[in-house]
């Protein structure tokens, strides 16, 4: 039970969301898809209002001197907004994850068991900066039959208010109750949200490791943690340098403020002398600050010396740490010690090295000969994602529709009783799968 005032405004919001979600859970796929189309259209119509709200957020954030990586995530230009709207449309085209029959089994003649997917209920999503996350999450929640309570960071309040206003306007002309999507905007509401175990079924915090731990320690609601992205790229001794250089540049500099950009480059000692000067030139052309261990400094004497803190830091900026390793085993040991189990990649032409890396690196996303920036629900074909889970238990990696449903067992009989199947003359079950 929650312990704070039953008259709390947030309680009332959560109750409305729960009620709306219970009706959404049984809506047809067609009705949900119509709602998603309406959301995309409403966002398109409100494009100018949303972009102006974001400009106001960015101006206020700039005046307050927020960190550069956070500012980059906050910015929502026309290109980002268009991509987010396309993502909504893509979610509408995906298969409905609700109502899937996972098990269809005859236990005995006339006694049939089914396991069928169903919505979780109400999601509580806490995120900072990225206002387009509200768009992605709302579309996924509706397609998966869930209500959602969004809690944005203070720096993105104006943007998210404009976005959620448009979403609710779109839903108002559909079978989906606009109360399905709610927005919270104050820090105090975060703590209140974490107490709503009676009304919220899953909390997804998107932020630092310390923030995710804070959430986990202050709620009885299950938590799906989206934490730091300390991602690594390992350049193996059998790497093709013509691939390794552009992949490194893309993984670091294409968009350094996101969680799937690399923070540490590990280089096999046998290829370091040839590879490092080339990649350093390419990275420095993109204004990336390089920090290296002692062995790296012998090859690149003009870069900054790396410290122990660098190996465990998510810069989310144009900074990259470099370490030379003696073997693939050393690279894997470094990744498993300092990484965040988000995304790590190997560049090599040796299949044995790939097999070793894939088998021993304990991360949600493990890549070969491609950029870590591909670790994304949209790029995986999920339409969008509510976050990237770095926990060991599923769902893991980019969490799309399939990660937002659970299942229930349904059994139909015809007067069957357990006594028939117990005792000395117990009847045997047939246990025959029907699908």
Swiss-Prot record:
GO biological process, one term: L-proline biosynthetic process
Bilayer-spanning residue ranges: none
Organism expressing this protein natively: Nostoc punctiforme (strain ATCC 29133 / PCC 73102)
Entry GO CC: cytoplasm
CDD domains: ALDH_F18-19_ProA-GPR
SUPFAM superfamilies hit by this protein: ALDH-like
Gene: proA
Similarity comment text for this entry: Belongs to the gamma-glutamyl phosphate reductase family.
Pfam families xrefs: Aldedh
Pathway: Amino-acid biosynthesis; L-proline biosynthesis; L-glutamate 5-semialdehyde from L-glutamate: step 2/2
Primary localisation category: cytoplasm
Name of protein: Gamma-glutamyl phosphate reductase
Subcellular location: Cytoplasm
């Amino acid at each position: 039970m929650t312990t704070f005032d039953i008259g709390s405004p947030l309680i009332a919001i959560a109750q409305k969301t729960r009620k709306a979600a219970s009706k959404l859970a049984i809506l047809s796929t067609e009705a949900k898809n119509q709602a998603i189309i309406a959301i995309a259209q409403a966002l398109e119509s409100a494009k100018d209002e949303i972009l102006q709200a974001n400009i106001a957020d960015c101006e206020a954030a700039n005046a307050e001197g927020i960190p550069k990586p956070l500012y980059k995530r906050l910015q929502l230009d026309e290109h980002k907004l268009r991509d987010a709207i396309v993502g909504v449309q893509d979610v509408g085209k995906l298969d409905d994850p609700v109502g899937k029959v996972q098990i269809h089994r005859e236990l005995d003649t006339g006694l049939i068991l089914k396991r069928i997917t169903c919505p979780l209920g109400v999601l509580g999503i806490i995120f900072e900066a990225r206002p387009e996350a509200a768009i992605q999450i709302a579309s996924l929640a509706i397609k998966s039959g869930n209500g959602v309570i969004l809690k944005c960071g203070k720096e993105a309040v104006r943007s998210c208010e404009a976005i959620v206003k448009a979403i609710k306007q779109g839903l108002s002309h559909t079978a989906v109750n606009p109360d399905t999507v709610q927005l919270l905007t104050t820090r105090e509401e975060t703590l209140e949200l974490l107490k709503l175990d009676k009304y919220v079924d899953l909390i997804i915090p998107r932020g630092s490791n310390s923030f995710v731990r804070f959430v986990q320690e202050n709620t009885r609601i299950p938590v799906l943690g989206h934490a730091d992205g300390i991602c690594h790229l390992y350049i193996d001794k059998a790497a093709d340098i013509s691939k390794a250089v552009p992949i490194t540049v893309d993984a670091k500099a294409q968009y350094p403020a996101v969680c799937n950009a690399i923070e540490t480059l590990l280089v096999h000692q046998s290829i370091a002398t040839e590879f490092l000067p080339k990649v350093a030139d390419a990275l420095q052309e993109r204004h990336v600050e390089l920090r290296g261990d002692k062995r790296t400094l012998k090859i690149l004497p003009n870069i900054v010396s790396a410290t122990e803190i660098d190996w465990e830091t998510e810069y989310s900026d144009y900074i990259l740490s470099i370490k030379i390793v003696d073997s693939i085993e050393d690279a894997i040991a470094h990744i498993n010690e300092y990484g965040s189990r988000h995304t790590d990649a190997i560049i090599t032409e040796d299949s044995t090295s790939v097999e070793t890396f894939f088998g021993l690196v304990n991360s949600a996303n493990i890549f070969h000969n491609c950029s870590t920036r591909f670790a994304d629900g949209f790029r995986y074909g999920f339409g969008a994602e509510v976050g990237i889970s770095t926990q060991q238990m599923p769902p893991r990696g980019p969490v799309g529709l399939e990660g937002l449903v659970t299942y229930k067992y349904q059994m139909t009989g015809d007067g069957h009783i357990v006594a028939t199947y117990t005792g000395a003359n117990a009847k045997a079950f047939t246990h025959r799968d029907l699908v």
